């Protein structure tokens, strides 16, 4: 069966043929490849073609596909049972690893997805602050819960407008949109809505408008504004946690949030996420407090075991993040040089093992900047790279990832492919 035939079959039974929209390649044209298996830095489709994988399951696989230690931990856990819906030792072990690593994590709670983590963090923040208003930022993605599926109105201080069908306007009326990397837009919302804002949520390193890091001074201003107006500051580190560094985004700004969300890497490739923070906030959760949150598979032993194996490897690894950042920078420097040779404008960003690139001559600091990127050119580049065995995120507004099994030779292979791709694009127009 070919990729095309398999995708056609999938569309008969799965809505859109995929279980997450970006996988359909709608942003870049063409049709997706259908994956058969992965090993290390590479994936293989059902036609037997090999690709250097810079998606790595959208971030979780920092040690690549089929890591032996994580695989062993999962197999041993499966032998004991898939799920119990009851407390186990492994969930406490993983919770302890996380709480001991981050000084602002007094307690945490596990869930099964990043969407659940951010949704639950917002709920407990509102329960603690006794205020319903939430500030989020244009271009920041925090999962697909209704209150967060919004776009900006006529200005940063307006109510959000539902940007997905099926989301009632009443659900998003307490969500306010601010401009990323613009503290003045946040202060204006606080000032014009006295006593209403209970929480601010932000990706300190945005990953779904492409990779766009928040400025240190901007995040410090957010901390000060939340303190001044009595709002809970939530850092969404579902993507950046254990990806930007061993301590997530913290080394880049130094601020301590009231709540933090995690996902992806902490599950070692399995379905695990978490939210946690100050004791007085987390104690608002049921059964100790009045804020309800629950989940059948939350803290399931398979995901917890995979997470323990992944974080234990991280803790035992020397120079892991230095290696990964060097690879990511080598890749982006190579892409930029190749683009320059073809007289194509390209902006790049790197944070640890995360990278992003934009087809625009201007620096990208916020969502409006990101939208100026040439998505038509991106689509051509993506197709040209896929043809050459390099699997990049099929959207201008996603982040790429390197992994530990990758070598400089792998990066150079991708850079050479980019050089050929840019020449092809320039030649064909």
Curated annotation (Swiss-Prot):
It is found in: Cytoplasm. GO terms for molecular function: glutamate-1-semialdehyde 2,1-aminomutase activity; pyridoxal phosphate binding; transaminase activity. It is an enzyme of class 5 (isomerase). GO terms for cellular component: cytoplasm. Pathway: Porphyrin-containing compound metabolism; protoporphyrin-IX biosynthesis; 5-aminolevulinate from L-glutamyl-tRNA(Glu): step 2/2. Gene3D superfamilies: Aspartate Aminotransferase, domain 1, Type I PLP-dependent aspartate aminotransferase-like (Major domain). Homodimer. PANTHER family: GLUTAMATE-1-SEMIALDEHYDE 2,1-AMINOMUTASE (PTHR43713), GLUTAMATE-1-SEMIALDEHYDE 2,1-AMINOMUTASE 1, CHLOROPLASTIC-RELATED (PTHR43713:SF3). This is Glutamate-1-semialdehyde 2,1-aminomutase. The gene is hemL.
């Amino acid at each position: 069966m070919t990729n095309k035939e398999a995708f056609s079959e999938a569309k008969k039974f799965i809505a859109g043929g995929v279980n997450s929209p970006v996988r359909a390649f709608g942003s870049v044209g063409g049709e997706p490849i259908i994956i058969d298996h992965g090993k290390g830095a590479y994936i293989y489709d059902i036609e037997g073609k090999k690709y250097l994988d810079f998606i790595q399951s959208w971030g979780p696989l920092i040690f690549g596909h089929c890591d032996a230690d994580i695989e062993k931990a999962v197999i041993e856990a499966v032998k004991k049972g898939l799920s119990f819906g009851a407390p186990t030792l492994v969930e406490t072990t993983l919770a302890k690893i996380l709480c001991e690593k981050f000084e602002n994590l007094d307690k945490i709670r596990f869930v099964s997805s990043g969407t659940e983590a951010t949704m639950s963090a917002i709920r407990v923040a509102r329960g603690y602050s006794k205020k319903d208003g939430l500030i989020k930022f244009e271009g920041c993605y925090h999962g697909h819960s209704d209150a967060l599926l919004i776009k900006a109105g006529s200005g940063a201080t307006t109510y959000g407008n539902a940007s997905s069908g099926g989301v009632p306007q009443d659900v998003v009326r307490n969500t306010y949109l601010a401009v990323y990397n613009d503290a003045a837009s946040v202060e204006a919302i606080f000032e014009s809505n006295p006593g209403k804002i209970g929480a601010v949520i932000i990706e300190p390193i945005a990953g779904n408008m492409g990779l766009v890091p928040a400025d240190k001074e901007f995040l410090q201003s957010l901390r000060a504004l939340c303190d001044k107006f009595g709002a809970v500051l939530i850092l969404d580190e579902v993507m950046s946690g254990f990806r930007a560094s061993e301590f997530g985004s913290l080394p880049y700004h130094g601020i301590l949030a009231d709540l933090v969300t995690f996902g992806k890497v902490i599950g070692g490739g399995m379905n695990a996420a978490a939210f946690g923070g100050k004791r007085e906030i987390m104690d608002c959760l049921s059964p100790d407090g009045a804020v309800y949150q629950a989940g059948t598979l939350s803290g399931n032993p398979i995901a917890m075991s995979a997470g323990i194996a992944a974080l234990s490897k991280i803790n035992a690894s020397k120079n892991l993040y230095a290696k990964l950042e060097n690879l990511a920078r080598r890749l982006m420097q190579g892409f930029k040089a190749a683009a320059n040779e073809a007289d194509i404008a390209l902006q790049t960003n790197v944070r640890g093992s995360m990278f992003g690139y934009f087809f625009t001559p201007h620096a990208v600091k916020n969502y409006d900047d990101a939208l100026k990127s040439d998505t038509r050119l991106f689509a051509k580049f993506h197709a040209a790279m896929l043809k050459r065995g390099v699997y990049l995120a099929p959207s201008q507004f996603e982040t790429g990832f390197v992994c530990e099994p990758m070598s400089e030779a792998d990066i150079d292979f991708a850079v050479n492919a980019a050089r050929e791709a840019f020449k092809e694009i320039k030649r064909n127009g």
